[in-house]
A protein has these predicted regions:
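Short beta-strand-centered aromatic/proline hotspots
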Residues: 16-25
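Glycine-centered structural positions embedded in regular secondary structure
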Residues: 17, 33-36, 50
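Short, solvent-exposed secondary-structure boundary/capping segments
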Residues: 26-38
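Intrinsically disordered, low-complexity, charged/polar segments
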Residues: 41-82
């Protein structure tokens, strides 16, 4: 599964938000990738250490459960009362 900046993801806790940053760990002492490389996209099948920030949250790569590649748009004319 490939994740990119701007994708909407859901983690194992059910939190959903837009990916803002992808950090890849380059040492064992930095598993979240805070000091490592920053990327615009990452293939989770590579199994590197690292983490993403999304909305007010962050999670390790192995905690990502789904990636929504399409934006969810709510049209005002579909609401009752408009």
């Amino acid at each position: 599964m490939i994740i990119k900046i701007g994708d909407t993801i859901t983690d194992e806790r059910g939190r959903t938000a837009t990916v803002e940053q992808i950090g890849i760990g380059t040492t064992k002492s930095d598993p979240a990738g805070e000091l490592g490389l920053k990327a615009d996209e990452y293939d989770l099948e590579l199994n590197y250490l690292g983490a993403i920030t999304f909305g007010d949250y962050w999670c390790y790569f192995n905690q990502i459960r789904s990636v929504n590649k399409t934006d969810i748009k709510v049209l005002n004319e579909n609401w009752i009362g408009f």
